[in-house]
């Protein structure tokens, strides 16, 4: 059999672009996108993507060029997940929750040829581009606006418009053929940043092959079925919407796009369009529970919810399921292209008490089909942990959907792929049934509302405050966001000599430090609590013992912000609620 060689007929490079072509042929009358009054069928979406790709090519966008985009979950961002790679380029969806400094760092590192910009983020983009232009006076980044009906069509940067590009695109048959016939399945399809840090941004390079395999594994693992109606509550800039940007096309489904994720909008779209599937971080569960009495009535049909980003509390899962949402827990990383572990439900679990069922649902689960292997190993010895649900180790994974590496960062890439595995940095256990459960994060990453927060980045900002001597940031519980940063601070001696009014002084310092962070960080990264200590706990080598600080933080409570404001100005809480 050694004489049987690979050829063009039996070795076609894998790419999720083929999902779009197939959907347009197999489902010509099915709705592909719903957004307000806008409706597209799959042939229309196919045509729009081909035209946009042709226009990008006419603008000299070519292989491996980076195309950045700042947009909410609108049809344009969905279409660009196909059109940009169809032009041979690499899509860079930017987290629009970051501040201008962080976005400037991403643009500086990615060096895009074009920036697509939704008008709602114009001010943020202006500030980011101003920061870049102050460093490079020759900066000339073309900006293409994505307009909405409620934003008048005017171009503040360049006279370029998204819809105009689609209208003027003229794809020839030979050009279209090349759009769906890539040369190498390992070519990059997307560049996703794990952090907006200015010091060391990590741009995760995802391949066509990885995106294809992860997408298929996700739609099979979730058992999406044919023609799902998918509600976009998860930002598409998060791991390309956990690959469901491509997955809805693979199943001939309908994408219901949303600009704002609020309880009224979610419930309205669910009822109006008979939504069957949605993804979200656990904090969205709290939004769902805030609906009105009509919204909170049981659904006429189940809405399947895939959740991840942080472990959902079992009690929260229980409340949401009673509203007709069928929750499945998943675990993934940007470096893994999307979800890699699914908590697949077992029939025998149906006979267990409800509380125990919810505990099982909160676990991360078993590997997707496209993952070659997952293990929990002792970080020092690299020996596998026993499947006892108790012995902790680092979660390691390997498979064809894993990233190519970090852009322009060989050192970080080498560290990530040590010992032939992707080192996730997450600490967990394996239960006797093979299900993995995360217990901690070895790199001290705080996950707040599905957003990853680097404790080191917050510490670096706090250290710039003149009176801070030492600081360490860990996660503390938050009733809405799951976790939030808590800062432990040692002030300079001159700030701690007067003991009589220490409480008052420390309360004042807490407000000052939090305000300082809000001036220098995205607000979701800022500490909600500052604890002052005489000294930080350390080991014999002088290393700060963060596990001890986490134990303290677990017992702390974040006060409702309205109550805090009311106390400070000595007015009734109702005075402020009426103004929100």
UniProtKB/Swiss-Prot annotation:
Entry keyword annotation includes Ligase: yes
Record bears the keyword Ligase: yes
UniProt organism field: Arabidopsis thaliana (Mouse-ear cress)
Enzyme class, spelled out: ligase
GO annotations of cellular component type: peroxisome
Name this polypeptide is given: Benzoate--CoA ligase, peroxisomal
Disulphide-bridged cysteine pairs: none
SUPFAM superfamilies reported in the protein's UniProt record: Acetyl-CoA synthetase-like
Family: Belongs to the ATP-dependent AMP-binding enzyme family.
Pfam families: AMP-binding, AMP-binding_C
GO biological processes: defense response; glucosinolate biosynthetic process
UniProt keyword list: Ligase, Peroxisome, Plant defense
Catalytic activity entry: benzoate + ATP + CoA = benzoyl-CoA + AMP + diphosphate
Described function: Benzoate--CoA ligase involved in benzoyloxyglucosinolate biosynthesis in seeds. Glucosinolates are secondary metabolites involved in pathogen and insect defense of cruciferous plants.
GO MF annotation: an example: benzoate-CoA ligase activity
